[in-house]
């Protein structure tokens, strides 16, 4: 039987390039992905390289608070 909090949590990844650069007329929004991470294996914030359709390239997507 599991004790305490669940190990797997749902996190939201947001494009750091869109957030830093600001939303311009060329980019109509901010790219976000929803994924899961294991809290015990990765206690820090998760950063993955994902494709951003607004930047038209692969950028680093960082974990944000819900």
Swiss-Prot record:
User: What's in the keyword line of the UniProt record?
Assistant: Chloroplast, Plastid, Ribonucleoprotein, Ribosomal protein
Q: Does the keyword Ribonucleoprotein apply?
A: yes
State the superkingdom: Eukaryota
Q: Which GO terms describe its molecular function?
A: structural constituent of ribosome
Record bears the keyword Chloroplast: yes
Query: What GO biological process terms does the UniProt entry carry, in alphabetical order?
Result: translation
What is one Pfam family matched by this protein?
Answer: Ribosomal_L33
Subcellular localization = Plastid, Chloroplast
The record's principal subcellular location, in a coarse class, is: plastid
Instruction: Provide one Gene Ontology cellular component.
Output: ribonucleoprotein complex
Please give the family membership noted in the entry. Answer: Belongs to the bacterial ribosomal protein bL33 family.
Q: Which PANTHER family match?
A: 50S RIBOSOMAL PROTEIN L33, CHLOROPLASTIC, LARGE RIBOSOMAL SUBUNIT PROTEIN BL33C
Q: Which protein is depicted?
A: Large ribosomal subunit protein bL33c
Organism per entry: Oenothera argillicola
Gene name, please? Answer: rpl33
